[in-house]
Amino acid sequence: MSLSRVCLLTSLTSLTSLVAGALIAPLPPLSYAAAPLPPVSTACGRDTDPAWAPTSTRFGEADGYAPYAGNGYLAHRVPATGAGYAASGEKTGWPLFTPRYDGAFVSGLFGRDKDLAAGREVAAALPSWTTLDVRVGNETYGSATPAGRISHYRQTVFLRCGLVRTSLRWTTADGRATDLTYEVLADRSDVHTGAVRLRMTPHWSGTATVTGRLDPRGARRLTLNGDGTFRTQGTGTAGAIAQTMRTGGSEPGQSTPPLRSTHRVRAGRTYTFEKYVGVDTALTSSAPRTAAREASRRAARRGWSGVLAANAAAWRRAWAADISVPDSPQLQKWLRSAQYGLLASTRTGSRDSIAPAGLTSDNYAGMVFWDAEIWMYPGLLVTHPELARSVVEYRYRTRGAARTNARMLGFRGLFYPWTSASKGNLWTECQSWDPPHCVTQNHLQGDVSLAVWQYYLATGDRDWLAGHGWPLLQGIADFWASRATANDDGSYSVKEVAGPDEYSNGVTDGVFTNAVAATALRNATRAAQLLGHPAPAEWTRVADGLRIPYDPKRKLFLQYAGYNGSTIKQADTVLLIYPLEWPMEPGARASTLDYYAARTDPDGPAMTDSVHAIDAAAIGAPGCATYTYLQRAVRPFMRGPYALFSEARGAKSGAQDPLSGFPAEDFLTGKGGFLQVFTHGLTGLRLREDGVRLDPLLPPQLGKGVTLTGLRYRGRTYDIAIGPLTTTVRLTSGAPFTVHTPTGPRLLTGTLTLATRRPDLASTTDAARCRPATATSETPGLYAAAAVDGSPATSWSPDGATGTLTVDLGRAAPVTSIEPEWTDGRLSSYRLETSVNGTDWQPYGAGAVARQVRLTVTSDDAEKPVGVRELRVAQP
């Protein structure tokens, strides 16, 4: 044994209780290299592209919206300090109302706290496993380090390989400066493994102490033991977390109790410390302690370069499906962040579903809602069916509890709780009892059935349909047949329900509820035919007889029987258009979209405008409302340098919801909806038993087009490139298949060329329609482009009493009229001006030659400013 090894081992001392739970190996001989730091690994690809590597250069800039590393099983928020635990004073919303923190989570792990959420199951959290403390003199670098002691700051999320890197200079009170670089990943190639690397370059010589530990402050709803084992509170799930440490290329040491090591360091030399973490529970292993220890050692044997390379390769495979928007770098960044969020919270082979915030936090207690089936699942299904499968496998896994739930409620078949956790038990897991959404949000049953049928359509897996899909389709159909009430006229009603609009409770014949119920009954009947099973006649009878509230004079579907036009919280009736594809007479889709889009609470959850965008694309009304809704689906909700998604525009989600609190983030529900605008909205993609349907559309604001690569259908892979005039569909692997188009079915054998719909080019007398528009200020969600998109349901509003809207008409010509259509509110005054060059302006006079027009509006109430639904301009 070398002298340096002897000195190192003899300096090790046991850690205090702060390192409880660590299964940790000692550091081999300390390695160092001359400064500067080693070159950045190239495994992450184009790590300077902002769309692939969002970056913060200001310490604390991302407070409340910290980045994360995740692999679908294991995930960790990474605080501004680069590793360890951090918390804020802000509280989460319903049902926890607890302080937010940068936590570590494991898929499917739940616990119970009698003093929290009425003692029902909520997500458990691990101790923070990324901690590698550095102590110099009497100071320790960590979450308590003052911002004034930190400089040269840079934190980057390498989306291409799921790596978070934080580099900075830490200066102690006595002036000693040390460069620190932390790198954190959750290995996608070996999902029970996480890894942390610290590179330390002191600009002084002396003594430094490095501590690898598990921080118990991060643990929630579990009891942690000194040997690294734990057990969740209330649910009794056993688990373990193990650590192995090494430096440089040395071999890892043997597992020992927690350690602290003190080293002599020299100025200008770089010292490398690596920590490999293994995590397992009784949910996935019969011997979680042994499995966790082996996962940790397995990673340590591979070393940092091996782990990083394998992880990056796994991420490269995941990124084979991508969306490219060359005209908009900002939109591109948002798209990549949205995809990363879903990928980091899903994995192949999982039987756990996706919570609204995935594995990024315990927002919404980590519960599973309809968010999974309706908002996150569809985009995954057409790009990563192997990941999407976890959503429906979770429902299959929890079907036993669903059957018990139905029986105890007095119904046949299966009944899934509005929110569920480990097993799907209505009474020990569902959180929403006042109002009683646990038993009235019945549309969830139809949402689950729809997802099951969509999985079959996307994969064509008849064996899965017979073994896993059919029991769910049959059980849910039986539920609806027993839930519906026969009326005297032979029709059927579903009473005492709450639809997706959570502002309406205890209603009769919710239109989406009844429509999705009928769809579930019909899909079950079709599955029975495919599998050779008898289908009860009552399934068809109830499906055909369910009342669908509709006003034929207005061509308007009513949200429920007796609906009076009140404000709604979120998308409800508009879901008939997509994803249900409910049959409608001409004009009904447009009437329904416009009516409900104008009545949706602007403070409602983030996903609503994504379905508005998809609906608008499907309708294709003259104008460019699709882009308005696309902007509304993402711009108001993006937060921080890493483009995390907030649940709401402001500080509260749903102004009329007494249970709402600080908005959830990273809100994967919103990200999933946003992605569907591209996968299903702009492409017009719909799944069929004998192929896919495509009907592409391109908003003018995305003039160079949109390309989707790596789309999947029944074992095939294909790309769609939507251009300004035509769309190219290219088969990249697999057998030919049918593409249904507006002109008829076509066989995709190599490439197909389809017409791209351009509703912005429809004939019009309005010279301002779909022209570039800007404003001096905008209320979030009420953007300038809305005033010229041709839709009466959208509008621009200034963010204050006064604002100016400017429209470029594209050519200088006489302007014969300018007509603003106002939103509600008290208008004080307005001014119209024109210009031929955008610099020199004069008051508008009929017939004046102009290329630009602008409108300045002043309102009496700065809190409720008047806006513009449409600014119409006439030119010969």
What feature does the model see in each segment?
Residues M1-P36:
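Secretory targeting and sorting signals
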Residues V19, K652, A755-A812, E821-Y830, ...:
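Disordered, acidic Ser/Thr/Pro-rich linker "stalks" and the adjacent N-terminal cap
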Residues P36-A365, R746-L748, T756-D760:
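Acidic/polar, glycine-enriched structural segments that form the non-catalytic walls/loops
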Residues K114-D179, W433, D489, G623-T774:
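Non-catalytic C-terminal accessory modules of carbohydrate-active enzymes
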Residues T346-T360, E386-L450, Y456, D463-G467, ...:
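Helix-terminus loop motifs that line ligand-binding clefts
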Residues V368-R399, L450, L457-A458, G467, ...:
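Active-site core of glycosidic bond-cleaving carbohydrate-active enzymes
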Residues G475, F479-L531:
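Acidic/histidine-rich catalytic neighborhood
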Residues L855-E863:
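Short beta-strand-plus-loop segments that form exposed binding edges in beta-rich domains
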